[in-house]
Amino acid sequence: MSSAFIQTFTQNVPYHSDPTAIFATLCENKPNTLLLESAEISSKNSLKSLLLVNAAIKISCLGQRVRFHALTHNGAAVLPLIEQKLAAHVSVKSRTSEQLDVEFSPADNNADEDSKLLAASIFDGLRCFTELYKASPLPVFLGGLFAYDLVANFIPMKNIQLQDDGITCPDYCFYLAEQLLVIDHQLQQAELQTFCFTQHQENALQQEAQDIAKKLLEIRPHFPLKPASTEVSVNLNDDKFKKIIERLKQHIYCGDVFQIVPSRRFSLECPNILATYRQLKQNNPSPYMFFIQDADFTLFGASPESALKYSQATRQLEIYPIAGSRPRGFDADGNIDPELDSRLELELRLDHKEQAEHLMLVDLARNDIARVCESKTRHVKDLMQGDRYSHIMHLVSRVVGKLRPELDALHAYQACMNMGTLTSAPKIKAMQLIYQFEQEKRHSYGGAVGYLQSDGNFDTCIVIRSAFVQNGITHVQAGCGTVLDSGLQMEADETRHKARAVINAIVQTNNKANQ
């Protein structure tokens, strides 16, 4: 097999405290770009921003087909290496100098769990990059989205029919970084990383890096706004949604599931996407914030919840379940009333239904971790802590374990998807019932956004408190953890509380544009 050429360049570039303005300057209207940001949970102070300025390859999956689309000459040099790497596991459907389409065999649902995990699968469309560039002096970076519906390729879907809702989203969509801007807000430093996959492109890429550095001297802090409606529609009104909850409670009563998370989708116009993301960050700073700008959609959000995190150095795998919520305590003027806020938190902590729901999901996270981790390494590191956000507060826990040596982060994600806080338990039956009753794909909602590096490190957040924008319309989906004694209206209201932060940011931005 041909060796994988890799040369990396780094340079310090001017620091700017507003990554959204940097993104507007470097990537405005440019597809296949993304911004991933992190903030400290309690203080909400920005920690780090990762801005994928230029992508070499877009990797997208739908069903068992994976497409590798070279976006640059640099990326095109990698396609033959990918084909060679995957040759034994795929059938090649089409091949050009700029694009490679391959198809994997479907998962064998009759195989045992470990055999399923270790078998060739669509996850190898991403794994091939970590294997090709394992020796890279600077870890090669893949950033993007795992959709919720990726799981449908790995669980039995017999007799489940999904309606076409007019929204299109790949099962996964990742970008191989050609130029990555790494911003450290604590040190107030910025570094531009360039990844060269063919020696013929070294000079061109170094020149591109210089051009990016110059643009960083002229950041545009303000965005033009377009007028838009503030009317919100919902795919399931309260009555229809409560009927779904009532029918799902029958399945809980019969013992099919212990708990389940139905959801519904709110929609409204959103022509000012980046300005709305900035407004959301300002209103609701969160541990994980993201903005993905694809040719076919834009996805942005401020998620409080990690999906799966893995450190290759320690082989520690981590799940951060969030379950149990209350609205924040606002006074009549819309300001936080500390006394009311504290009372609501105490009510949340003492609520037996919320405790039961949370502990059930901690147990599910323990089961997920145990499936892929070494014996006796799984433990609950934090239990039922309180996290506060702009409009809602949550109970959170942290479950960790040491990944088995024959597995990697993608094996772990395959075993754990989708996260229990968006599905519930038993997980496979819950996901089947969700499809049966919602009757539509969830697309990005309940999936994961994050990155994978060639050194094996992996960090993702659950796609909640997010907006999926396509054809000028944004879709904000939110769910509720339903148990046997759940109140129907309370569950419907919970979806509204969870969607409020994103909807408010969209409405605020549209109102500014309409002035």
PLM features per residue range, with description:
Residues 1-515:
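Extended alpha-helical targeting/anchoring segments
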